[in-house]
């Protein structure tokens, strides 16, 4: 949840929370980030997009929306140089070597890359964190560049009008400006999605570009496998949202992996051809931000912490936290759902009056009570709508009102115990606590004598499945071994 976004009014209706409880954390509210990280003063790009190209105009129109939807631009000049180096090598052997590209690193933990008409290329820091070497990044970029050179973006533009119409219908049905805007944003993001035939065509072109640029042509199949493995890992990781990941818009059928391998064989047997570029890749991503950014706060196990806002709270055991820019969402067993957000306190009225001001549907006025939570002014109430019961808890800190909405199926006894965990755990952080919070980053280290998979993976932070994630980000199989002098990635502060 962003410190900037929390200051804007987030009209979270009780009905919307019921939808959250029904649909789960991924589909309730899609990510809609505000840009929070400034671009570099001298961004590394292959060339400027031609300003008189109508395709460039299409890309230029969508560019700000794409950037905003993925957390803004990520600032790291050495990483930008890495991606520009890879793109330059691919451009030289592409079907249109005169095509220029504007490369944007996106400040998102999602694993994604895509292209827009006019030579706009995007890659998330999450994808760079998963990749094992430069050839795997090249595999993704060559695939996206193939979409550009094959004019796939022009073909898919015809679908955009239908997306807008569908978004208007969603807005009318949900009777929510926020819902309509989010649906429209999802429609715009589908500009980056292609048909199955276009995907296969881009695969073929991309593998050829890989091999001709001197990269390992088998990297395409290898990274498709890596993304599938990450998807399986994430499917049981409660803190991972896959709604904006590459595989959500790029199907990963086994035949697609085999097709990539088959075309790679034209350059020679696997393991005998092409450069992986691992050393300069690792140099380029050392220190890369991993997971949540400071602007959005951090999820650590069952706890949400936000250093800039100076707050923290816990969710009950067994709940899954999804930290989005506009709110923190959590879902638990039995269709229990929680939403936490904040609004600017512009009127300085009592919190009991605030709860009764009309933003809660189905409010039971007789249940409104003023309370104190860890020394903070607060108020609670109950509400009911259709088959749902709700607890509403609000707290005031300085000029902000923080809001918890908890939903359970009607009559379920877990409403009070769930809300009680939130209320009792919410507190201000001390300046020392806030200062001690640090984001997680990719750290590149060299294996030393006596190091083992167990000892190295034990240094991983931000996950309970240390060995699994360690193997994943280092492309290590069950039978893989390491030796002194090898360079590997870990995740730490």
Region spans (language model):
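Primarily a LysM-type cell-wall glycan-binding module
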Residues: 431-464, 486
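Residue-level recognition of short, solvent-exposed, well-ordered loop/turn junctions
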Residues: 200, 314, 448, 477, ...
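Bacterial N-terminal signal peptides that target proteins for export
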Residues: 2-15
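A Zn2+-metalloprotease active-site environment signal
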Residues: 11-14, 22-309, 313, 320, ...
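Extended non-catalytic domains of envelope/secretory-pathway proteins
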Residues: 318-320, 328-329, 336, 341, ...
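Signature of long, low-cysteine stretches enriched in small and polar/charged residues
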Residues: 339, 356-403
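Surface-exposed amphipathic alpha-helical segments
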Residues: 138, 321, 404-442
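Extracellular LysM carbohydrate-binding repeats and other cell-envelope/extracellular binding modules
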Residues: 465-493
């Amino acid at each position: 949840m962003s410190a900037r976004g929390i200051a804007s009014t987030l009209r979270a209706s009780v009905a919307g929370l019921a939808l959250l409880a029904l649909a789960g954390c991924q589909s309730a509210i899609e990510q809609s980030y505000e840009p929070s990280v400034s671009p570099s003063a001298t961004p590394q790009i292959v060339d400027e997009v031609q300003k008189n190209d109508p395709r460039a105009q299409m890309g230029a129109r969508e560019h700000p929306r794409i950037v905003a939807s993925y957390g803004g631009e990520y600032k790291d000049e050495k990483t930008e140089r890495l991606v520009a180096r890879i793109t330059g090598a691919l451009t030289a052997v592409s079907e249109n070597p005169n095509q220029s590209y504007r490369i944007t690193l996106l400040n998102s933990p999602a694993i994604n890359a895509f292209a827009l008409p006019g030579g706009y290329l995007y890659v998330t820091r999450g994808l760079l964190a998963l990749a094992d070497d430069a050839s795997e990044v090249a595999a993704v970029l060559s695939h996206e560049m193939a979409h550009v050179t094959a004019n796939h973006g022009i073909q898919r533009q015809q679908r955009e009008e239908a997306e807008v119409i569908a978004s208007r219908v969603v807005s009318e049905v949900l009777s929510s400006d926020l819902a309509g805007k989010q649906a429209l944003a999802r429609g715009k993001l589908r500009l980056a999605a292609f048909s199955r035939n276009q995907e296969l065509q881009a695969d073929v072109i991309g593998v050829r570009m890989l091999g001709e640029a001197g990269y390992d042509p088998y990297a395409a199949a290898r990274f498709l496998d890596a993304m599938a493995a990450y998807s399986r890992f994430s499917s049981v990781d409660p803190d991972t949202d896959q709604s904006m990941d590459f595989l959500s818009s790029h199907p990963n059928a086994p035949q697609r992996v085999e097709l990539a391998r088959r075309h790679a064989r034209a350059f020679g047997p696997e393991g005998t051809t092409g450069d992986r570029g691992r050393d300069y890749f690792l140099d380029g991503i050392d220190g890369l931000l991993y997971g949540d950014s400071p602007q959005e706060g951090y999820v650590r196990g069952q706890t949400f912490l936000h250093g800039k806002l100076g707050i923290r709270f816990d969710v009950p055991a067994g709940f899954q936290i999804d930290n989005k820019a506009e709110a923190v969402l959590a879902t638990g067993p039995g269709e229990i759902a929680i939403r936490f957000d904040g609004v600017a306190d512009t009127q300085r009225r009592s919190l009991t009056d605030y709860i009764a001001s009309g933003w809660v549907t189905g409010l039971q006025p007789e249940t409104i009570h003023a309370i104190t939570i860890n020394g903070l002014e607060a108020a609670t109430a109950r509400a009911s709508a259709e088959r749902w019961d709700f607890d509403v808890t609000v707290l005031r800190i300085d000029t902000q009102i923080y809001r918890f909405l908890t939903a359970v199926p009607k009559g379920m006894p877990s409403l009070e115990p769930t809300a009680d965990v939130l209320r009792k755990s919410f507190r201000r952080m001390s300046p020392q606590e806030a200062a001690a919070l640090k984001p997680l980053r990719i750290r590149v280290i060299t294996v030393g004598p006596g190091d083992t998979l167990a000892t190295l993976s034990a240094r991983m932070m931000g996950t309970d499945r240390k060995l699994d994630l360690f193997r994943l980000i280092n492309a290590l199989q069950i039978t893989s071994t390491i030796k002194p002098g090898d360079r590997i990635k870990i995740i730490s502060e």
